[in-house]
Amino acid sequence: MRGKLTALFFLFAACAYGQEFGKNKVRYDTFVWKEFATPHFRISFYDRVEPQLGKIASFAESAYDELARKLNFQIPEPIPLIAYATHAEFEQTNVIVEGIPEGVGAFAVPARNRMVLPVDLPDAELAHLIQHELVHIFQYEILFQGKLGKALTTNIPQWFMEGMASYLAQDEDSRARAVMRDATLGDRVPSVADNVTGYFAYRFGHMVFAFVEAEWGMEGLRDFIFETRNTLTGAVDRAIKRAFDLDVEEFDARFRAWLRKQYQAVAAERGDPREFGPAFRVEEGVRSAEASPAVAPSGELVAAFTTYKDDVDVALFSVPKRRLFKNLTRGYTTRYEYLVAQLFTVGPDRGRDLAFSPDGDTVAVFARSGRGRVLLLLDALHGGIKKQFPIPQDQAMEPAFSPDGKTVAYHAFAGGQADIYLLDLETGWSRNLTDDPAYDAAPVFSPDGRYLIFSSQSGEHAKLFQLELSNPQNRVQLTFGPGDDEGASFSRDGKALYFASDRDQGVFDIYRLNLETRKLSRLTRVIGAALNPVSVVTGEGERVVYQAYTKGRWQLYMTDPAQGTEVGEEKAPQAVTKREPFLPAVTVAVSPDRISAVKSHKLFADYVQAAVQYSQDGTLLSQAFLSFSDHYGDRRVNVLLESVSGYTNFQAAYINLAKRLQWGVTVFDDRSYFVAADAFTGREVRLKRLYRETGGAVFAQYPLSLYLRAEGAFGYIYRDVDYPVLFGGQLFFIPVTDNIPFLQAGLTGDTTGWNDYGPHWGRRWTLYFVQAFDAKGGGTLSREIHLDARQYVPLSRRNELAFRLYSAAADGNRPSLFYFGGVDTLRGFDYRSVVGNQVAYFNAEWRFPLIDHLVLPWLHLRDFRGRVFLDVAAARIDLPGFSQPFRFMNNGRLQDGLSSYGFGFSVELFGLPVHWDFAKRWDFKQTLDRGFNTSFWIGFRY
């Protein structure tokens, strides 16, 4: 039978636990928390953080003292600060349950005003980071009066929140300052009324607040902040009008004029990188970013990171033609999570993240894999991975091959220090070369293999140092003066060093230091920034390849060092004796009597969310989600309230996330219905209160990796149902109650890669088994197996094919029935109108972009996308005492199978994914509908 199925069945819907998709957040480490109280903070730490506790407390109190004076405001309660030893451990925090990418340096949340951060940074940067996050705590108290509900519902622009934090923390370095300098002189400064997001929001907002203080003083800046609080929705335009009596257009004009004045001197004296030599390009018309150049010994190829495929790859560029030659990491992989590429996948540090082997056959790069990082040796001839080495330290990056190719030097963090390590490629063993409190990074070998040059920072700035490999304690300082010096490399004859420095006007340029005469020459004078110079021999002589920031992105350029300008001499190398440390304004002594173990785990409101979904037959699905957590997010109580067309459902769960094995307990009360038809009259009826299930379960899941996890549950359900029977040609419902113990086990995998609009590549699947026992009759009440598999095949950057196969089968004394239809399961059919204990449906879609942004005076629509789809499904009822005859196809036509085809559109509207579908049912030969069945629904697609 086609369309509605015969309503002769028994319904049991076993509650499934943990069958949601998504990659895993793996808790690799165990954290035994302690607390240290200071006048304004409660600092949470564990054993690996304790050696740095005094430093953290001093930086935090110094930041509080400065901000309280500037803002003339006091935080009423001690501020929780949760410190992690490294970024790898910080990524395991459960304060935010979602995955945390390495590009996120730290965060603050309005729920209990918590600051969460890693401490594996140079002291000066750590102090700025703490102050940045502390500004957010002041914002939560000033703007939201410490109320979580207001924080979640007030829509203050990202540029305001992050720009204020950046400005009051004064955390901009020379790389960051290059962004607004480049945007201003390129006439790309947006309006404060625009929705500025991403990294640019930090830089743009920083300069807005700098402008406000420059024009109206600190009092004017405070007025701006408090007027923003006084607007009901956080509308910045109203705050600007109230604080400065300016409309947005006037404010924008004055702001842009002020910016141009700030950069007048730079614009007059500096230029585009092309003025110093030609650029490298992937191909004509392709906009991409490139960074971290490394030159092959032959001089014919340059390895670099590139984003031309909307991913971060390692590619080779031809030096003579300055064009893309080969992609070494083409395609998608699960052998690693991502390549370690500063400014692309991780935050900025020092130096380059690629290295060529002396024989030119191998390119070294670090990648994230599991808890830490691995060193990948890429095949420069054919692409792909030749070999990989696990790295025992955290945050490994910036590889450099020794001249004999037997070892690789790199920067890493361990024991509270950032040092240079040496990896033996034959044994896989590594040893610490620098082992000092300074922040050491960006190593490079001298051509004779006797020395190592690296960048080291103990106070405000990083300088170049040299150590003797035969005696690593024998070190000398090579560069001096203002600014940071980094990213060194040797000239081909070994007589000079090329490096990047921001010693002039705070702008990074490329310099050449003659190691014999100590004469210094500047090779570039760019508006943005120039980094990571490497020497290459061409037919025209020695050239220097480097990366430069211009027109909003990083690109590779080549310049002639002979055209450089002499800018003086460096002092003679000096032996390293004493290094000046970074000193905070306030020093806090760690007193053991103020340290206490964390014993209680009280819960508090952490998050609230609401969602709605609507289908074409008028069915309204609404949900409210409430989450309560302890201080560290490791113990949570989640409550889900749901309404399906007037039927209310409830589920509450306690979840323990403190270790890798995650477990929980849940209780629930669930009611639902489906659409059926009387087999004799054909009259459609909507069955009210078809079933109700009340019960509880214990569940657990164990992540085997980022991509795969095992799950299981056992529990008990009390069921109250209306059981359908046929008597005398009429359909009757008999009340039936059951007590059902059950077991469940499954596997879930997810390797999906996402674009901003949704999944783009990879696959996700779940396979699980449920066994429900018959407490009354004995044996098995229902035994079922489920498979939900989805595959995404990229066709281009924003085109993909999407496939889904769902299948479920059940048997037993009273097998479970499964229902689907409508939304994006089987379009052209009513919601939940297809039912059976043996079901399957298949969806195929081609998804493509239509309009990226549609800006109207009253509305901004984004990601307007289209699709063409085909749905095929089947459902059969095969119960004890009744078996529905079923034949999927007959003579090339669908008989009991179901199918539809059509097209649809999706758009993000007011932050919600909204969908329109136009479907026609067909039997593989003939269309069964005259016109399209139109559906409108809100929710997330597969």
Map each language-model feature to its residues.
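C-terminal outer-membrane beta-barrel translocator/porin domains of Gram-negative envelope proteins
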Residues: V590-D593, V665-S672, D678-R689, G696-F699, ...
